[in-house]
Amino acid sequence: MNARLRPWRALAVVLTASGLALGAAAAAAAPGQPSARSGGHAARAVTAPAASTCDPKASSLRPAGPPQVTPGTFMAKIRARGYLVAGVDQSTYHFGFLNPLNGQIEGFDIDMIRAVATAIFGDASSAHLHLKAISDEQRKPDVMSGTVDIVAHTMTISCDRLKYLDFSSVYFDAHQRVLVLKNSKATSLDDLRGQKVCATTASDSVARIAAAKAIPVPVTYWTDCLVLLQQGDVAAISTDDAILDGLAAQDPWTKLIGPPIADEPYGLAISKQHPEFVRFVNAVLQQLRTNGQWAASYRHWIGTPVAPIPQAHYAG
């Protein structure tokens, strides 16, 4: 491997190792450093949803009004407990990552979930938000079992997941793309037929990699993919451009290639047992869209220009 990659490889290893050591829970986020990133999330013409009866972008419940905690609701139970339990990522730079300098999990997703906690408790105290670091594979079972109240984990709203979980309205529009080393001759996923392409085990990307006749290499964390790419063990990484942008920021010897492969609309995952909580969360997200907080968070964590704010569409 080229020696110039080693410092960046070391950073990826540190982030992965420290993330694994953190385990189940972490403290609330502290302000981080903004990234220098050039957009890339504007709306584009990409693959349409596979099922005509399902529209992931218009599958959530309409808010009943401003976010309010009324007696007997799930939000009231959370308030009585004293804290919201959120399943989050700890290895996706910009969105949910463990900052090795302060030991805090921080990022765009964390800002979204912190706003939900603030709306429930009426203040932004970190004591009211418990962050539980989970892998991609843990997202669905942890929501369904009640291990967490909500998941903010770069989680794509899909027709399959909607069978088991409810989601908020779309809070971020991403698109699946491909990341390779800068010396790669590949220009799209189609050029990687017969070659190894990394993705996390529970991501939607794995099936699309296989469909392109590439060889999926599933791992637990996205930083594991970056290490494999740097070591030459895989030819590429394919997932949401939001995640790939974070990996590219950690290694300047990588580049994104090809057109968008599929839409990846992100939503906050919630149990189907708590529709009132879905409506509450959607009311919070609507406030973030209109009061400037969404744009401020994007600017802080992801950079400029700020992408168009995803507009809410509801099923009922």
Please provide the spans of the model-predicted regions.
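Acidic, polar ligand-binding/catalytic clefts
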Residues: T118, S125-D191
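Extracytoplasmic small-molecule ligand-binding "clamshell" domains
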Residues: T47-A50, P56-V151
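N-terminal export and membrane-targeting signals
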Residues: M1-S18
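Alpha-to-beta junction loops
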Residues: L84, M144-H153, Q231-D240, W253
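Periplasmic-binding protein-like
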Residues: A42-R44, F172-V180, D241, D245-V284, ...
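C-terminal region of N-terminal signal peptides and the immediate post-cleavage residues
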Residues: L22-T47, A58-S60
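Extended ligand-binding regions for polar small-molecule ligands
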Residues: H41-V69, S203, L268-V306
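Bilobed "Venus flytrap"/periplasmic-binding protein-like clamshell domains
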Residues: H94, I105-I120, M155-S158, A174-L226, ...
